[in-house]
A protein has these predicted regions:
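Cofactor-cradling patches in redox/metallo enzymes
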Residues: 31-38, 43, 47-132, 139-147
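Short N-terminal or domain-adjacent regulatory/targeting segments
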Residues: 1-16
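Conserved beta-strand elements of the Class I
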Residues: 19-21
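A charged, well-structured terminal subsegment
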Residues: 143-159
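Short, surface-exposed ligand-recognition loops at beta-strand->loop->(often short) alpha-helix junctions
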Residues: 26-29
Length: 159
């Protein structure tokens, strides 16, 4: 779906704005990926989620501790959490992504949010293995992320 189709789908099926909170968490200082998906201007001709009429987007930036990320998710009543991770030496990104899932489970929040990770070497398979609902790598845009998130929200409601 493109930006306008996403907004129409949300209006028809969810009937309120979808709240998305995104960040590069842990020690990751890179924001190119999360900014490409979240920011108003977007990337490569694709607008970011901040421009979507029916999405309330909160980009927390980089180096956000997982605990703070969860705190903000609760504060904003997030429907969707987006985590951007650059692949690191010693697989710190894997530890960080795993820790976030564990913290969400401990808080009883894991099943209440759509959890998505992305980055230059993140695959959908790796994301699923780590306990995420989806993973997006290079060549993906806000349209792709939004389409997955909102269709997953609707699927979960029907269960």
């Amino acid at each position: 779906m493109d930006m306008s189709e996403v907004s129409e789908y949300i209006k028809d099926n969810i009937k309120r704005k979808v709240v998305v909170v995104g960040a590069s968490t842990g020690t990751d200082a890179h924001t190119v990926g999360i900014d490409a998906i979240m920011n108003m201007k977007g990337f490569a001709g694709h607008y970011g989620l901040e421009r979507y009429e029916m999405i309330e987007a909160h980009n927390l930036g980089s180096q956000v501790p997982n605990e703070e990320f969860i705190k903000k998710a609760i504060e904003f009543k997030a429907d969707v959490l987006l985590v951007s991770q650059t692949v690191t030496q010693k697989n710190i990104h894997i530890q960080n992504l795993t820790e976030l899932v564990e913290l969400l489970e401990a808080e009883g929040l894991r099943d209440k949010v759509i959890l998505i990770c992305g980055g230059p070497r993140i695959t959908h398979e790796l994301a699923k293995e780590l306990g995420y609902d989806a993973g997006f790598g290079p060549g993906k845009y806000a349209d792709d992320v939004a389409t997955f998130a909102i269709t997953e929200m609707v699927k979960r409601r029907k269960k």
